[in-house]
Amino acid sequence: MTHFDTIQKGAQQMGAALSDETIQTLVKYLAMLEKWNKAYNLTAIRDVEQMISLHLLDSLATLPYITGDNIIDVGTGPGLPGMVLAICYPEKRFTLLDSNGKKTRFLTQVKMELGIHNATVANERVEKHSHQGEYDHVISRAFASLQDMINWTLPLPKETGNFLAMKGVYPSEEIAALPKEVGLVSVEPLNVPNVQAERHMVVMTRKG
């Protein structure tokens, strides 16, 4: 099975209807990630089939949660899930923020080579990011805890915006320790094809 077929099948299993053009762009992104990873160590995952499942399909599992038009991915790494989402939603705006220069250089190259015009790459620490109160969604796979995520990103969403945290097993202790400034909306399992480990999406909003 080709990488195109694997991505297409996985997306279909999750109910994501992606055009052939979108899947082709994801295949090109995957090829760039594999190539750059050999030199710059962008991800610990080396096997391409695992990259598809653990990175691409895992990122595609978040598609139903992206209902707003202006999104920031904090600690995006090599663009997960932010670059994947930007490829799938060309009509929405994405800011891909990471303090690691190797990773943001890779993203800048992806943006240029693949023509991803709706993504802005920000090489900075989240506390230095000046666009506060502008985002419909603040999404991240990167934070060690929900508390850390909220502490670092609290000023970023609009009043009507939300926080989307991708987690592994149900994070009951982290939920119990959530800062008082946010309210828990939902915790939903993410069913990612070819991924046995538990995955959850935690949705939170800012109070007041």
From Swiss-Prot:
InterPro entries: rRNA_ssu_MeTfrase_G, SAM-dependent_MTases_sf. The keyword Cytoplasm applies. Pfam families: GidB. It catalyses: guanosine(527) in 16S rRNA + S-adenosyl-L-methionine = N(7)-methylguanosine(527) in 16S rRNA + S-adenosyl-L-homocysteine. It is found in: Cytoplasm. SUPFAM superfamilies: S-adenosyl-L-methionine-dependent methyltransferases. Specifically methylates the N7 position of guanine in position 527 of 16S rRNA. HAMAP family: 16SrRNA_methyltr_G. Keywords: Cytoplasm, Methyltransferase, rRNA processing, S-adenosyl-L-methionine, Transferase. GO terms for molecular function: rRNA (guanine-N7-)-methyltransferase activity. It comes from Marinomonas sp. (strain MWYL1). This is Ribosomal RNA small subunit methyltransferase G. GO terms for cellular component: cytosol. Its EC number is 2.1.1.170. PANTHER family: S-ADENOSYL-L-METHIONINE-DEPENDENT METHYLTRANSFERASES SUPERFAMILY PROTEIN (PTHR31760:SF0).
